[in-house]
């Protein structure tokens, strides 16, 4: 049985994940002693992520980070910790976004024209971070894939 600790279990994604874990006969939700977990999933607030990285590093626990809006210092800490523990950092874990990213990479690599990009997103009224981590991740993907400098600008419109 895989033991999972969910950091940020009271948020939208955390609640969804804990419900799925509780329904599974192959997964066990760890709620108190994080050191007993086989993996930690972080859907918390950016302020909490740094501490969970340190705890996972100290206890040699693999970490999945779905928290967005992380600062530069946290990204540096993630890179350091990834030398000692497995870390998956993903702003959006949906299959649809994965397929979108793959399509964007294929398009950017094959494109020969100069283009401008607009990433437009609409959210529910309770959305905490704007632009979303997904939009920022897509912008970074385009920028890092554009080896021929065909993308003039990339804008994000978030409502």
Q: Language-model features: where?
A:
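Rossmann-fold NAD(P)-binding glycine/threonine-rich loop
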Residues: 47, 53-54, 67-89, 95-107
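Rossmann-like NAD(P)-binding element
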Residues: 34-51, 57, 61-64
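Glycine- and other small-residue-rich loops at beta-strand/loop junctions that grip anionic moieties
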Residues: 41, 66-68, 92, 127, ...
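C-terminal substrate-binding/catalytic lobe of Rossmann-fold NAD(P)-dependent oxidoreductases
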Residues: 3-34, 113-159
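Residue-level signal for alpha-helix termini/capping positions
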Residues: 57, 109-112
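A general structural motif
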Residues: 1, 36-37, 60, 84, ...
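Short, conserved beta-strand edge motifs with alternating hydrophobic and charged residues
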Residues: 66, 90, 118-122
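Electropositive phosphate-/nucleotide-binding environments in soluble metabolic enzymes
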Residues: 7, 11, 15, 43-46, ...
